[in-house]
Every structure is written in C-alpha cells, then in structure tokens.
C-alpha cells in the first residue's frame, strides 16, 4: 500500500510531484555527459529529484552512482566514501564488488564497521590514506572503470557542501576540478542542502568549481500542482478535502515540499475513511506541525545572543530600516 504523504526521506513514484521541466533537463544532461550543479534552499526535494531522474534513465550504456557525503569530515573521508560507492554501484555483480575492486585500485585494506543500532547498515572503509593512495589515483578510478566497462558513469554527490567545510577546502576543490574536468566518460551531479555554502563553491569566480557545469536553481513547486496532488491523495485514501483547504496547506507551509507533505499527512490522520476535512482539522494540524518542530526551532535560536534575538523580533514585527540607530 502506497503512503499517501511522505516527508523526511526522498520520495519517488506515487509521492513524487511535478518537476517535469527539471526532470527533462537533468535527463538530457546525464545522457549528454554534462556536469550538473543543483542548487536550492533546504526542503525543496533535490535528493528526490536526482533519485527520480536516476530511476527514469533508461540508457543501458549509462551507470548512475549516488552517494551522500554528509558524514565526511576530511578529504580522505570523502575519498574512501567515493571509492566504496563507485566500486559497489558499478560492479557487474553486487556480491563481487570487492573482488573486482582490486582490478581498479591496488593496496586496499578494507575495514567494516557495524552500528550498535538494530537494523542499521554497515559502513566500509577501504583504508585509503595519504600514504597508500594519491588523490589523483582515487579520483581517476571512475574514469578507468567506465573505459573498462565500455559505459559512461554519472556520479551524483549529495551534501556536496561538506567539501566547502573541510580544512584546506579550496585546495581540495582544485584537486577535484583538475581531475574531473578532463574525464571523458564520467560526469557529475553535485548538490547540497546548505545554499550559502553551495553558492560560495560554485558561483564565485575565484573558486575552482566556478562554471563547472549546468547550474540549475530549483524553485518551489507551484500551488496549483500541490493542490491537485493533495486532493487526489486524500481521495485515494477515501477522504475528502476541498481545493480551498488544500491551498491553505500550501500557503501555511509556503510551498516548502517537506512541510507540505508533513502538514498534509497530519490533516489526513485526523480523518477516517468517508469523512471530509474541515477548517478546524487544518487548524489543529497546523498547531501539531508547529509543536512537532518546536524543539528544532529552539535548537536554532539557543546559540543566538539577546541582541540577535531582538534583531529577529524587529524583522518579524515589520521593521525594515534604521537598524542600529539610537534614540
């Protein structure tokens, strides 16, 4: 049974909405070997879009590789993650990926770490260090695999802003760009959740990744698309919501994809099959949404000084000028 609304994770198929133009543009770039930089504020569905495009890509001569580097804190953390995912996701048979890895990268000493949490996946470190492998050797591996397999590879790197937060970030970026820009059989889709850091990496002329590829700015999904989606998904769940109340969900969440899905779900759970959503239901769900996010909001403002908080209060109150003037 399909979930009617999904948030907090990447969505696909039934829960994926809109993005026809962006999907076509990404597909064309992937097929054409064009590098892509995907930028937007948080919670607009970048990861969902990229995974959606990877699933739609029907070219047997193209292999897509997806990796999330949020946990990478150093240059060689990134190299280990990149290498492991490229090797695993391009292997001819998944169970043979490590045996095949020896063909493309020597001196590997894998270490497997298990999480203490039940049902958690394990992580693999290939033992890549400055003493065992140069950056160029690691970064060129995907190109070597592509040539050997007679395929093209598209590597999609989520949370790419982590590169910008590493020590010696600009030098790392320069090393990546120097190798990647000369590859003929591998292209890259780079995206992340911190818009200001992504802008610094890709939009500043002084940075190595300036004009690295097709920069796509992801905008919010239109209200009319959301309303159709919400109304139809309520109907699929044998519940009824008016266009006006569906539009109110969009207005309250300002069309941020994750929050639209979350608020719609909270409203959905208030009704049983055969029932119709009321204004009071939407009002209650709004309060539930705010309460759910209270802890997150508190964590965000805890580090702020009283002066900074007063500054924010002034903006909320509509003050837009004369900041800093004494009476």
Protein language model regions, located:
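A short, basic N-terminal segment
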Residues: 1-36, 41, 111
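Hydrophobic residues on short alpha-helical segments
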Residues: 27, 308-316
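P-loop NTPase nucleotide-binding core
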Residues: 34-35, 39-44, 48-155
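Conserved Walker B catalytic segment
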Residues: 125-194, 203
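Short regulatory helix/loop adjacent to the ATP-binding pocket of P-loop NTPases
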Residues: 195-213
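Conserved AAA+ ATPase "SRH/arginine-finger" region at the nucleotide-binding site
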Residues: 214-225
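Amphipathic alpha-helical "lid/sensor" segments that cap RecA-like P-loop NTPase cores
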Residues: 227-295
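Short acidic, hydrophobic short linear motifs in intrinsically disordered regions
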Residues: 320-327
């Amino acid at each position: 049974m399909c979930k009617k609304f999904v948030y907090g994770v990447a969505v696909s198929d039934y829960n994926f909405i809109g993005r026809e133009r962006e999907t076509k543009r990404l597909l064309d770039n992937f097929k054409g070997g064009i590098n892509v930089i995907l930028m937007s504020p948080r919670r607009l569905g970048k990861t969902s879009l990229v995974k959606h495009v990877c699933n739609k890509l029907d070219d047997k001569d193209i292999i897509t590789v997806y990796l999330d580097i949020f946990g990478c804190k150093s240059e060689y953390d990134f190299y280990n993650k990149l290498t492991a995912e490229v090797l695993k996701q391009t292997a001819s048979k998944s169970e043979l990926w490590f045996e095949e890895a020896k063909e493309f990268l020597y001196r590997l000493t894998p270490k497997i770490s298990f999480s203490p949490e039940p049902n958690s996946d394990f992580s693999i470190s290939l033992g890549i260090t400055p003493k065992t492998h140069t950056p160029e050797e690691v970064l060129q591996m995907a190109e070597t695999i592509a040539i050997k397999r007679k395929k093209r590879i598209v590597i999609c790197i989520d949370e790419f802003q982590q590169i910008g937060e590493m020590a010696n970030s600009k030098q790392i970026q320069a090393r990546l760009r120097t190798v990647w820009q000369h590859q003929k059989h591998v292209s890259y889709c780079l995206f992340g959740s911190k818009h200001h850091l992504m802008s610094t990496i890709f939009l500043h002329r002084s940075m190595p990744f300036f004009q690295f590829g097709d920069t796509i700015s992801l905008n919010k999904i239109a209200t009319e698309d959301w309303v159709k989606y919400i109304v139809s998904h309520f109907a699929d769940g044998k519940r009824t919501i008016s266009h006006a109340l569906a539009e109110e969900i969009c207005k309250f969440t300002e069309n941020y994809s994750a929050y639209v899905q979350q608020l719609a779900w909270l409203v959905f759970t208030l009704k049983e099959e055969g029932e119709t959503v009321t204004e009071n239901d939407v009002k209650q769900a709004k309060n539930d949404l705010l309460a759910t996010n209270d802890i997150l909001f508190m964590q965000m403002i805890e580090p702020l000084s009283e002066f900074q908080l007063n500054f924010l209060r002034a903006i909320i109150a509509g003050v837009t000028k004369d900041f800093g003037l004494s009476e």
